[in-house]
Amino acid sequence: MKRQENVLAEREREFQTKMKVIRRTHHKNLVHLLGYCHDGPNRLLVYKYMSNGSLADVLFTLEKQPYWIERMEISRNIARGILYFYEECMPQIIHCDIKPHNILMDESMCAKISKFGLSKLLKPDQTKTFTDIRGARGYVAPEWHHRMPMTVNVDVHSFGIVFVCLFKPLKNKLV
């Protein structure tokens, strides 16, 4: 579960739209949103429980280190989830915060993308958008530092950093 407090009134419509889209997304590599409730400006999002924690827990805990073949499968899972955002979702979703802490692992060690709080929805005729910088230092795409429009490439860049973390696991200095 994730609690969001003090949601501003002007963001209510954006929140409701995002919840409608996320509730309609069904893919084996996305964490399933079971529902949400609200009390005034406070929100409680309920996601399916992921028993193996986050990819960060797996990568940065010596006892949980995956084998190379498992690392390849984890990278495929993440890539499939990102591809779903761009090729199958309507509207398209730019996640904006792909990082090991936002990739959750189910009981079979299948990687699932979670935490859509920073995501942006693209309109059907839209290929890019402008927004304030979002995401974790070390994982954000260079476009944000140059105030360029955001495209699906920002998630591809973040995935590249996660991919490096998968195959060269070091102490987590990026987050």
Language model segments and positions:
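Conserved eukaryotic protein kinase-like
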Residues: 1-175
